């Protein structure tokens, strides 16, 4: 501490993240306490500091004794760890059905010393008016923390997406507040991925004293756009509308990227968003059981065009909304997070909670008798509707109305017309059940095992003989979401294998079981996504559970903890493509309806080619259609009558190959199966491959002598990213894969190590 710094009028210790029950001391003197992981804490420390070295000490109390004592006083009905709702700490810290119980404590975000004399910026609110054609009016409200003084000014500079700064605009502050207005001519609008570009403007705000000296400064990157959330009506589904254009939300549910948040890097978070855009996603739902993510993640969403469904951090439990102190704590938490994040164009909607509507009851709380706590009836209690409204409509809704009136807010999910559909995983129904649900599907999913390389990261060789080995089951959490659960992962593993065997044949070994579970997961989610995209606008959103993992595990994810793509992630590139060709087989009349689904904002023209083969690859029929599809439309564009072919060859011996060629990114293909994959008498596809390239970049061409379903490339022991995987290859139609290696290999080394496998290779022969 220098003498000059010590002379400043105000010296504040700023703690941006304390997890969670903390006492802060400076030079041995307590300056304050913290009890909310999500809040920013500032303490006046000027009188305690001295020139030279100073000591800052943060003492943390464990969370478990605290919540257990609160729970002993009054049990809160919950699906998760008893008592966890009493503390403002990330719920999944206490375990979830995809992650471990690691109840952390510590300093998890920056600590800084803030010094100022006259004034500092407290809040900058930016609103947009798109009411005039080819113009956007910006209103920037500035709020400061200041001592009574005259002559303070604010200066604003708007920099365009191409980096050109505009003329400075000034305004004099009155009572520490001021407003600056400016108009953007010929605005460049921000669009979700796949709909247009993501131009970002920078608003720089300088706080000046009467002599023009800089006192404080901040900046915000914004996108010029309008965003609406239309909740479900009797005739229309829930949907998002950007810049006046409705769009189909294609994405997944995001969970914390690590069980220990401080281990996630900006580069990793950015790569996650790049991987979303790479498979044609435009949306991610930031689920309510984690934490408010770092600015770097939202910056990446802004840049890539990923629209965020932003949950406040309340999930799967009742909360003590009858306690004024709890509500005050939440109000401050929400205010700080809304101020920090509301300017991001990627945030499409704020949502009060995840699945707490299932705990909402009548006018009074329904408490669980103490003798039934811990039994099957312990979760049957209800939160009173007045307290639910007090928390999610009045407190959080009030913060949104005050601080972000232009942002969409809904009280909960699935409480706004969206659907969480779990009859397949939890109910054990076949994938066919997905066709019986409609609307905006914001949660649904099925688990798969990780890739062999990830499995090797948490198992010993003796664990890799069976997916039922103790360590392997330990990393499957679906029926033991908290530390006190006793199930060993058997139930979740059984669920995976039940549906795998329903759809596919018996895998031949451990590694084949891992791969086949991923093919099964991709098969089910693709079946669901195709159906919902076909019926647009009856359904306007498909957001599967889940995008990522927070540890190496068996889970619902399409991309694992290490960022390795599973089969589902590769297939998402196809079923989320801007133009989707698909076929729907009707076993009653033996026809295949040919669907063309387009998210493009302009009409699409092209040729739709179809071919029918047997499982030996012999062509039995073919045709070509000239197709024009209107913008943002899905419809049947043709029909194939297979009656005679089914009669002659049997449906289990037929494949229908589809390809729509609209040029460039508008080219898409698909395969229609007339029976479950297990019923197909597949033949050895006789896969072969060649390679060209060098170093870390290669192009691999794969050929099949017989029809090959779900073909994938792998290089055991080598980290690689493939341009595509788990695709279908017909004889005479070789497929090209771009291969990106993390370390260079010679071509001979690559050809020696590379493996090309297919569904056929996973089966016992």
Set out the residue ranges of the language-model regions.
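Short glycine/proline/serine/threonine-rich loop/turn segments at secondary-structure transition edges
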Residues: 6-9, 49-53, 66-68, 186-200, ...
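Terminal connector regions
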Residues: 205, 209-218, 640-683, 742-765
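Intrinsically disordered, low-complexity Pro/Gly/Ser/Thr-rich segments with frequent PxxP/GP/PP motifs
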Residues: 169-188, 611, 615-649, 719-745
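Active-site-adjacent substrate/metal-binding segments within catalytic domains
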Residues: 7-15, 19-26, 32-35, 118-125, ...
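Extended acidic/polar, glycine-enriched regions
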Residues: 47-55, 141-232
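Active-site neighborhood of glycoside hydrolase catalytic domains
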Residues: 303, 320-415, 562-563
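Substrate-binding clefts and catalytic carboxylate motifs of secreted carbohydrate-active enzymes
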Residues: 92, 99-106, 118, 350, ...
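Accessory beta-strand-rich segments of carbohydrate-active enzymes
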Residues: 1-120, 283, 291-293, 306-309, ...
């Amino acid at each position: 501490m220098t003498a000059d710094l010590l002379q400043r009028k105000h010296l504040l210790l700023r703690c941006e993240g304390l997890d969670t029950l903390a006492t802060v001391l400076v030079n041995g003197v307590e300056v304050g306490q913290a009890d909310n992981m999500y809040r920013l804490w500032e303490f006046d420390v000027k009188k305690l500091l001295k020139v030279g070295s100073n000591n800052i000490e943060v003492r943390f109390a464990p969370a478990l004794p605290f919540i257990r004592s609160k729970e002993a006083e009054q049990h809160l009905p919950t699906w998760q760890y008893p008592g966890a709702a009493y503390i403002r700490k990330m719920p999944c810290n206490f375990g979830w059905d995809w992650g471990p119980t690691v109840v952390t404590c510590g300093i998890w975000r920056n600590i800084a010393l803030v010094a100022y004399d006259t004034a500092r910026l407290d809040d900058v609110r930016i609103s947009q008016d798109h009411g005039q054609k080819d113009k956007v009016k910006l209103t920037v409200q500035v709020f400061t923390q200041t001592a009574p003084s005259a002559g303070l000014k604010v200066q604003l500079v708007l920099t365009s997406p191409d980096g050109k700064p505009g003329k400075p605009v000034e305004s004099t502050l009155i009572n520490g507040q001021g407003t600056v207005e400016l108009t953007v001519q010929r605005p460049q609008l921000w669009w979700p991925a796949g709909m247009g570009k993501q131009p970002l403007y920078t608003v720089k705000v300088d706080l000046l004293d009467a002599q023009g000296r800089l006192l404080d400064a901040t900046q915000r990157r914004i996108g010029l756009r309008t965003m609406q959330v239309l909740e479900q009506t009797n005739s229309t589904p829930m949907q998002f509308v950007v810049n006046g254009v409705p769009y189909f939300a294609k994405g997944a549910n995001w969970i914390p990227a690590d069980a220990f948040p401080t281990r996630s890097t900006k580069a990793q978070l950015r790569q996650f968003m790049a991987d979303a855009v790479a498979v044609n996603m435009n949306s991610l739902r930031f689920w309510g059981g984690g934490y408010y993510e770092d600015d770097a993640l939202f910056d990446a969403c802004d840049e890539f065009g990923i629209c965020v469904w932003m949950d406040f951090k309340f999930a799967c439990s009742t909360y003590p909304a009858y306690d004024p102190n709890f509500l005050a704590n939440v109000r401050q938490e929400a205010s700080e997070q809304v101020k920090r994040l509301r300017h991001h164009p990627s945030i499409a909607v704020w949502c009060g909670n995840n699945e707490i509507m299932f705990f909402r009851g009548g006018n009074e709380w329904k408490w669980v008798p103490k003798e039934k706590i811990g039994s099957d009836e312990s979760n049957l209690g209800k939160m009173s509707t007045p307290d639910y409204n007090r928390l999610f409509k009045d407190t959080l809704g009030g913060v949104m109305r005050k601080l972000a009136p232009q942002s969409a807010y809904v009280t909960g999910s699935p409480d706004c017309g969206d659907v969480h559909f779990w009859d397949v995983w939890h109910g054990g129904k076949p994938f066919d059940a997905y066709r019986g649900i409609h609307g905006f599907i914001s949660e649904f999913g099925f688990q798969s095992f990780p890739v062999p390389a990830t499995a090797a990261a948490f198992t010993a060789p003796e664990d890799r003989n069976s997916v039922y080995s103790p360590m392997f089951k330990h990393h499957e959490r679906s029926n033991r979401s908290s530390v006190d659960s006793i199930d060993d992962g058997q139930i979740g593993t059984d669920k995976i294998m039940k549906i795998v065997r329903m759809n596919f044949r018996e895998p031949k070994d451990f590694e084949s079981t891992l791969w086949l579970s991923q093919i099964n997961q991709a098969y089910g989610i693709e079946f669901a996504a195709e159906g919902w995209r076909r019926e647009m606008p009856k359904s306007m959103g498909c957001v599967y559970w889940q995008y990522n993992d927070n540890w190496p595990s068996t889970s619902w994810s399409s991309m694992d903890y290490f960022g390795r793509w599973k089969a589902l992630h590769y297939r998402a590139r196809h079923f989320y493509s801007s133009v989707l060709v698909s076929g729907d087989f009707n076993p009653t009349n033996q026809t295949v309806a040919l669907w063309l689904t387009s998210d493009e904002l302009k009409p699409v023209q092209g040729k739709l080619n179809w071919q029918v083969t047997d499982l030996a690859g012999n062509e039995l029929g073919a045709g070509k259609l000239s197709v024009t599809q209107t913008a943002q439309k899905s419809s049947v564009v043709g029909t194939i009558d297979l009656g005679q072919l089914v009669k002659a060859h049997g449906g289990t011996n037929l494949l229908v190959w589809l390809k729509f060629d609209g040029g460039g990114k508008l080219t898409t293909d698909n395969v229609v199966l007339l029976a479950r994959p297990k019923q197909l008498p597949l033949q050895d596809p006789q896969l072969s491959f060649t390679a060209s390239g060098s170093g870390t970049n290669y192009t691999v061409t794969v050929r099949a002598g017989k029809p090959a379903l779900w073909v994938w490339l792998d290089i055991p022991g080598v980290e690689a990213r493939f341009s595509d995987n788990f695709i279908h290859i017909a004889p005479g139609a070789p497929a090209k894969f771009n291969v990106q290696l993390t370390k260079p290999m010679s071509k001979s080394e690559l050809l020696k190590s590379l493996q090309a496998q297919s569904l056929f290779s996973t089966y016992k022969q």
